[in-house]
UniProtKB/Swiss-Prot annotation:
InterPro entries associated with the record: COD_ChbG_bac, Glyco_hydro/deAcase_b/a-brl, YdjC-like
Positions bound to Mg(2+): H61, H125
Gene: chbG
Family matches, as Pfam families: YdjC (PF04794)
Task performed by this protein: Involved in the degradation of chitin. ChbG is essential for growth on the acetylated chitooligosaccharides chitobiose and chitotriose but is dispensable for growth on cellobiose and chitosan dimer, the deacetylated form of chitobiose. Deacetylation of chitobiose-6-P and chitotriose-6-P is necessary for both the activation of the chb promoter by the regulatory protein ChbR and the hydrolysis of phosphorylated beta-glucosides by the phospho-beta-glucosidase ChbF.
Species whose genome carries this gene: Salmonella paratyphi A (strain AKU_12601)
HAMAP family assigned to the protein according to its UniProt record, in alphabetical order: COD (MF_01246)
SUBUNIT field: Homodimer.
Catalytic class of the enzyme: hydrolase
Cofactor: Mg(2+)
GO molecular function, one term: deacetylase activity
Protein's name in the database: Chitooligosaccharide deacetylase
PANTHER family cross-referenced by the UniProt entry: CARBOHYDRATE DEACETYLASE, YDJC DEACETYLASE FAMILY MEMBER
């Protein structure tokens, strides 16, 4: 059975170092897709690079935890900025869902304005779209526009009223992250997916060159390690040997 593998690099537009790392991992490695933060400091640079790479799938990385929102969000921001306090608000069930739905639409339009096309799919920074309160909003939005959505199926296993026409990969992994960033780890992810009989798989990654913006991230130098692994010739060969076809969210 042919299996589609989407290797999606998050954080396109975060910084020039991030952008260049993603492009390097696409041109000379196994990355096939990326998702862009439309409020990132280097989003215009990302759009410029993407125009030189028309085959690179570019989706939208919905942001509710970093930087300035595109719309006014007095219920979620502090001093005009987004932040990780969204987790506490989710636990307390005090999320301003109307604001979040409006911000999603505004970021989507911002993506179209910057990239000149619709995104291939949606996911989110720090996986906030998987919050139980937020997921139905994003799922309906994606289904209405006919675009795919990153789904951690174990997280939404008992979710009600999912749109029947919502597109996603059968499998998703965020395990290629943190301390264990190795070729062996990547291949274990593929083998586990194949064992489950999944016909499509998304593997999340964050390859980057380190610059001043990336240095401010709690997840900094591992991005360089990711880049090294993802551009390994032996990894590309091992993926092909396992029968995976590189693809984007337009292929599912």
């Amino acid at each position: 059975m042919e299996r589609v593998l989407i290797v999606n690099a998050d954080d396109f537009g975060l910084s020039k170092g991030q952008n260049y790392g993603i492009v390097e991992a696409y041109r000379n490695g196994v990355v096939t897709s990326t998702t862009a933060l439309v409020n990132g400091e280097a989003i215009d640079h990302a759009a410029q690079l993407s125009r030189e790479l028309p085959a690179l799938g570019v989706g939208m990385h919905f942001v509710l935890t970093l930087g300035k929102p595109v719309s006014e969000m007095p219920g979620l921001t502090r001093d005009g900025l987004l932040g990780k306090w969204i987790w506490q608000m989710a636990e307390e069930d005090t999320l301003p869902l109307d604001e979040i739905a409006h911000e999603l639409a505004c970021q989507y339009q911002r993506f179209i304005d910057v990239f000149g096309r619709e995104p291939t799919h949606l996911d989110s920074h720090h996986h906030v779209h998987m919050f139980p309160q937020i997921f139905p909003i994003v799922a309906r939005f994606a289904a209405q526009r006919g675009i795919a959505l990153r789904i951690d199926r174990q997280t939404v296993l008992n979710a009600d009223d999912l749109p029947s026409d919502l597109r996603s990969t059968q499998g998703f992994s965020s395990e290629f992250y943190g301390e264990e960033i190795t070729e062996a780890c990547f291949l274990r992810i593929l083998d586990a997916s194949a064992h489950r009989g999944e016909a499509s798989l998304e593997v999340m990654c964050h390859p980057a060159f380190v610059d001043n913006i990336i240095r401010q991230s709690a997840y900094c130098y591992p991005r360089l390690t990711e880049l090294e692994v993802l551009t390994s010739a032996s990894l590309k060969a091992a993926i092909a040997e396992r029968g995976y076809r590189p693809g984007s969210f337009l292929d599912i």
